[in-house]
């Protein structure tokens, strides 16, 4: 279930935050609809970075579809979200390039 542009709820009840994704004003609905369309009855895979939790104890993940689509990066490319730049993570520079 898509909760927000950067949060999803898994079938097992675990809430995860899409690592590197920051909500963008006026594009929340577009981002949520994009994620709902991409996740529609598909299996997803989670990949963790060196830091698994943020300062608010949110579990942070990179999300991939079964066809290896990198959801975090694809979402940034749509322009519906911004790149989180307040802390370091391994895909930060890649995400910044994708946002340009």
Per-segment meaning from a language model:
Residues 1-100:
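Small beta-barrel nucleic-acid-binding modules, primarily SNase/OB-fold domains
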């Amino acid at each position: 279930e898509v909760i927000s542009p950067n949060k999803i709820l898994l079938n097992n009840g675990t809430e995860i935050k899409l690592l590197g994704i920051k909500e963008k004003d006026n594009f929340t609905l577009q981002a949520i609809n994009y994620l709902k369309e991409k996740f529609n009855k598909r299996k997803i895979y989670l990949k963790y970075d060196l830091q698994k939790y943020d300062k608010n104890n949110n579990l942070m993940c990179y999300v991939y579809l079964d066809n290896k689509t990198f959801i975090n990066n694809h979402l940034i490319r749509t322009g519906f979200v911004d790149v989180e730049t307040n802390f370091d993570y391994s895909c930060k520079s890649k995400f910044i390039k994708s946002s340009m």
